[in-house]
Amino acid sequence: IVIMGWDLIYLILSFFKGWGADPNMYFNTNIVVGGNNLNGIFTPVVAVTAAVIFIWAVLWYISHKSVDGISKAVKFLIPVLFIMMGFIVIYALTLPGKMIGLTALFTPDWSALGNVEIWLAAFGQILFSLSMGQAIAVTYASYLPSKSKLIDNVLIVVASNSLFEIFTAVGVFSILGFMSLRTGLPIEQIATSGTGLLFVVFPEIFNIMGDVAYIIAPLFFLCVFFAGLSTIIAYLEPMSMA
């Protein structure tokens, strides 16, 4: 939820590129007080605190309506997420340098198959994205009719999840390829992982995109917000029904 709070702040900032010319400095001084260490862990950030409170209020409003409220929220969030991400991917594929990113995405490094950390990261991604072994699946399954085709449902969920992840990666790496072309830096150096990619690298990319970034950036951070909101709703459901 804290990361969603950061994203909500960046969603607002994206309308006027409020992170400034140095997104890394802005992130470490205004969002993560103390930088990437524990120096500022007990220093509250007013904007982040307000964003987290707002998100909890939205979650309460959705979840207190029980299954009906959650169902309506997800039926709205997921299709809108697909539409917005589709627009971003289509635009990303028009950017110069897109092939740099797509080549990096789809060119396999066979030597990595011998790296245990790669396998652990892959299994971790699968477990998290599919919610395997978690109470979410059990709770949602309890709402299904007794004659539901479990195997068919599993295949649909797995295929849909994997296809959307690949679809999203096409857009993300196309944009990273654009950044690589404009800056002259190798994509491996640009494509950091975690919050650095989301809150530092992408704002830097939006800074050099020009006026179109005032459309793409809000859509991007709104997609992240909707994805996070739908995920948290799923995690709250087992607790609310316990």
Per-region residue spans from a language model:
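Hydrophobic core segments of alpha-helical transmembrane domains in multi-pass membrane transport
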Residues: 1-15, 50-63, 79-92, 172-173, ...
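Helix-loop boundary elements of multi-pass alpha-helical membrane proteins
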Residues: 65, 152-155, 241-242
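Membrane-embedded translocation segments of transport machinery
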Residues: 71-233
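Predominant activation on well-ordered alpha-helical scaffold segments within soluble catalytic domains
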Residues: 9, 199, 203, 237-240
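Inter-helical loop and helix-membrane interface segments of multi-pass membrane transporters/permeases
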Residues: 3-67, 99-120, 192-199
